[in-house]
Amino acid sequence: MLFLNAKFIDLDLGANAVIVNEEDLKGTSYYPQDRVLIESHSGSVLGILYSTKTMVQKGEVGIPVRKMKGISLKEGEEVNLRHAEKPESIQFIKKKMDGQVLSPNEIRTIIDEIVSKKLSNIELAAFVTSTYVNGMNMEEIVEMTKRMAETGDMISWEKSLVVDIHSIGGVPGNKYALLSIPILAAAGITIPKTSSRAITSPAGTADVMEVLTNVELDEEELKRVVKATNGCLVWGGGVNLAPADDIIINVERPVSIDPQPQLLASVMAKKVATGIKYAVIDIPVGKGVKIKNEAEGAKLARKFIELGELLNIRVECVLTYGGQPLGRAIGPALEAKEALEALTDPKSAPKSLIEKAISLAGILLELGGSAQIGDGQKLAWEILESGRALEKFNQIIVEQGGTPKKPEEIELGKYVEEVRSPIDGYIVGINNTSITNVVKEAGAPRDKKAGLLLNAKIGNKVKRGDILYTIYSGSEERLNSAVNLARRVYPVNVEGMMIERISKF
Amino acid sequence: MLFLNAKFIDLDLGANAVIVNEEDLKGTSYYPQDRVLIESHSGSVLGILYSTKTMVQKGEVGIPVRKMKGISLKEGEEVNLRHAEKPESIQFIKKKMDGQVLSPNEIRTIIDEIVSKKLSNIELAAFVTSTYVNGMNMEEIVEMTKRMAETGDMISWEKSLVVDIHSIGGVPGNKYALLSIPILAAAGITIPKTSSRAITSPAGTADVMEVLTNVELDEEELKRVVKATNGCLVWGGGVNLAPADDIIINVERPVSIDPQPQLLASVMAKKVATGIKYAVIDIPVGKGVKIKNEAEGAKLARKFIELGELLNIRVECVLTYGGQPLGRAIGPALEAKEALEALTDPKSAPKSLIEKAISLAGILLELGGSAQIGDGQKLAWEILESGRALEKFNQIIVEQGGTPKKPEEIELGKYVEEVRSPIDGYIVGINNTSITNVVKEAGAPRDKKAGLLLNAKIGNKVKRGDILYTIYSGSEERLNSAVNLARRVYPVNVEGMMIERISKF
């Protein structure tokens, strides 16, 4: 046991960090990454031990203030530090490492201890890695999904026709929800859409919507907006939905893995938590997105449908073409503008955007009984074309706290560079990854006015000197940096008709 | 890219920590655990991103000062922060997760990036977990072992007969090396023994030896002592041997796994690095030690021998009884005293200690040609009994910077509690884990005078009121705490002859 004085410190290390001067640890049985309990007369706190030379002095212990819940220690008071029991989950994680199936109770314990921040990043990484390697069966996934939902806020609705649309993995420019949600809401279907901010893409749906209105709503506000309009388009982080998910994602990102059990549970737990009864899951397939081919997409689709059945959620999956951006605009403001233009004048909008928006909405119109099977897409188009979707969209904007705008009122980055074709030829490729990186380099998603507008898409004919795309940024320096990157990574590829020239027979 | 001012900070988070105020991260594409590069005109540093509310202010970035190597930034200077490439290892770790065999080059890259602190704890945990689940073949283990050795100091010797004895997993009271090493050194065999401080046990060999002399020697000092005496007994941490090992152990401990490939490489890399040609590996088997049964021990032994062959190190393994402590003394000072008594008067010493010390030394005397096969143990006993081992031991103590002591000069904890048998009966069990915990509670290994002295061992007959064991501590409070723990965990079990009484027919 060590005797120390408490000092408040604030650092997000996943689990609570408890920081001690390395001099105090020398020759003791305490090591960095040990799980320790800090106790005093006024309370106690559990944490993971870290050592420092300078952050706290000899005799001090830095304790976390970020999560004040459960911490009743006072700064400066004398505390003692001792080894704490390992959380129960460790043995279940070990079991999964050994290739065994976990019982419902074991899964629940793991999720509970993730949510209560009892597991260190090392322990979480061991859990994620072992589910990646050894997998989970459907019963395990169902239990994990349910528990992830139950450990956060659970939203319930009086209506039974509550639906959602969800895309797996990012296609740049994926702003279709700004069309589909108001179409469905206008048809009287309840669609409480929560979405993420950009994780790997240059603009998440929440980032795009934030150009037009407030997206940080809590549960009460969300329910009020949905009651008033049938729909909403808000950031999921404002509501405490399936909080284990974010914690798990934070350890998946560094090792670039997304084990299928976690992917399934992550998506479906949020559906359970928001009281969804029907969900359409969009699985983009192609180069530069998560799912590389149709067979893989179909396999994942079947898992989603099976999991949905076991959770009493009717799921339909759609494989969509993800090989190039959706529409022409990438970046928050450009995408908001393109969506608003499409709602205002759908006939002039990019076909890919309209088609995706009305086909996904159409499925839910059919599932919800608003349209006969086969007529959903037609009804969706009618709602869009009649202006009812735009009207509903503006109503949602107002209810979320914004003021409706015309497309031309949306401000774009004032530093602009047009990139032109060096030759006559055809667009043979548009590279999702390159576009994503160029738009991020231009400042998105933080700089909402940063983005890239494609002037041509795959298969289009271009002449030398034609504009291929335009880069926007709010900062001259960022613009230059993005242009330099674009020169190296070729967001758009043009080739002449002659693909190859063979000079010897 | 973020623009910030550098602030020096010191925290050991495995890889370099780069700490930014969470306000600065909001709406950006930077997330905690991202790998980032901090750049300025004067230099750059690679790190893992963490967020804080208070540790650094908005606009500041905390950069690590612990490892000054490669850090040429000045405090307060303007820097920019951007995403850094993932280390090459990540893809190889992913490959191991996918159950594939790694090439020599891939293994080397992983070890190199571990040593240069490029991998975060999450990434390390993914590596360790995936080798635990998917294993490694012998070629992979050989490559890992070699690279772990090469990335640290490599000690070479003019003599070819350089030997070592190594125990896997802790048996409490395992002080035999204080006898075996001087026996071998007295026989003219070179034995540069490096050992660890206590990891899970109450006293590592280095902790025990430190009661008698200095154990923190650097490479030059170690070589000088070995040149003068043929042997040494020093702490491995004073020399930079296979530095990847400590980093890996730090992520294994929290999840309580020790994948066999890592165990093999960890032991053998240090043998390679210290230029060992013959090694005896002691594998204690029994309750409360790492290896639970003989079959498991034999399997591990074969792996050690095979790995040794591929590394040009002749390895012999010995399975020893690890079901109760070795000798009667547990705790640094008590063990040093018991070892010194055994060197002074081996005939009165505990049989288990003498037997282990001379049988392990005997094998190396035979391997080294000092004794005929079958005569090693006899020669070891002669060296011990003649006083030559004690003389050599004192010579080593002097060369390492200490002054030889008589056993009775060793100070023990002045707070003492004798624990007596409540009944007439037999010692039916001595619990390694309970003893370890009681001795740690009494203050070991930090309090060198804390410990436990067994007065009886398994099978001994005791009368009611006989002393079973004595607990020592340098602090009254710790003694009480240890006595309280002992009352709950029963380090020694006594039972009457009548094991069970059946009262109904």
Swiss-Prot record, chains A, B:
Annotated catalysed reactions: AMP + phosphate = alpha-D-ribose 1,5-bisphosphate + adenine; CMP + phosphate = cytosine + alpha-D-ribose 1,5-bisphosphate; UMP + phosphate = alpha-D-ribose 1,5-bisphosphate + uracil
Catalytic class of the enzyme: transferase
Positions with a binding annotation for AMP: G170, S196, R197, A198, I199, T200, S201, T205, S266, K290
Residues at the catalytic site: D258 (proton donor)
Entry annotated with the keyword Cell cycle: no
InterPro entries (alphabetical): AMP_phosphorylase (IPR017713), Glycosyl_Trfase_fam3 (IPR000312), Glycosyl_Trfase_fam3_N_dom (IPR017459), Glycosyl_Trfase_fam3_N_dom_sf (IPR036320), Nuc_phospho_transferase (IPR035902), PYNP-like_C_sf (IPR036566), PYNP_C (IPR013102), Pyrmidine_PPase_CS (IPR017872)
Protein name as it appears in the record: AMP phosphorylase
Lineage: Archaea, Methanobacteriati, Methanobacteriota, Methanomada group, Methanococci
